[in-house]
Amino acid sequence: MQILKDRILNEGKHLGNGILKVDGFINHQVDPALMNEAGKEFARLFNGVGATKILTAEISGIAPAVYTGQHMGLPIVYARKRKPVTMPDQVLLTLAPSHTKGRTVELIVSPEYLAGGEKVLIIDDFLASGATILGLVKLAEIAGAKIVGIGALIEKTFEGGREALSYLNVPIVSLAAIKSFDNDQILFE
């Protein structure tokens, strides 16, 4: 998606160690117009997968997931990283390493919002190593739900996440695929 690539080139910054700072328009300050366009594009690309629900991880996956859900007419569920007091004692829980946090995080979903028989489309901000998305896949599997597609705003193809998820045999879509940070220059596929 060219408008996303342009924003990454103009405002994104490689911080080293494969970390891309895009917090001016995706994951701290959010550009609603950009997320709306991304949601439209995901809705177009995943139109035929038969999804009944969208699953993402808090916090940065929420904006693209909400706009995708709006354009697809689907509810979204986001995995929390801390269990609130309002959540039941029995939860769906898995652990996933976080590249940006530098530690393992919990991913928690209430079973009342993710159940067996659901057809789940995962939408997130990044696809890098695939660790967070694999955690979301595990939550869906624990619930008895089926993954029908995976979408990410930005993919860092050099980190191997797509390959780690290929066993699922579902469409995997990224709107901006980065092949390298060559001398801190962002290069797209």
Located regions from the model:
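Active-site-facing substrate-recognition patch
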Residues: 1-50
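PRPP-dependent phosphoribosyltransferase catalytic core
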Residues: 2, 18, 137-189
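A generic structural signal for well-ordered alpha-helical segments
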Residues: 46, 68-69, 140, 165
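Short glycine-rich phosphate-binding loop at a beta-alpha junction
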Residues: 50-58
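Structural motif
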Residues: 52-53, 119-121
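Short Gly/Thr/Asp-enriched flexible loops that form oxyanion-binding sites at enzyme active sites
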Residues: 63-72
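Short, glycine/charge-rich flexible loops or terminal/linker lids adjacent to PRPP-binding catalytic cores
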Residues: 74-120, 186-188
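Conserved G/P- and acidic residue-centered "switch" motifs that form tight phosphate/ATP-binding loops
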Residues: 125, 130
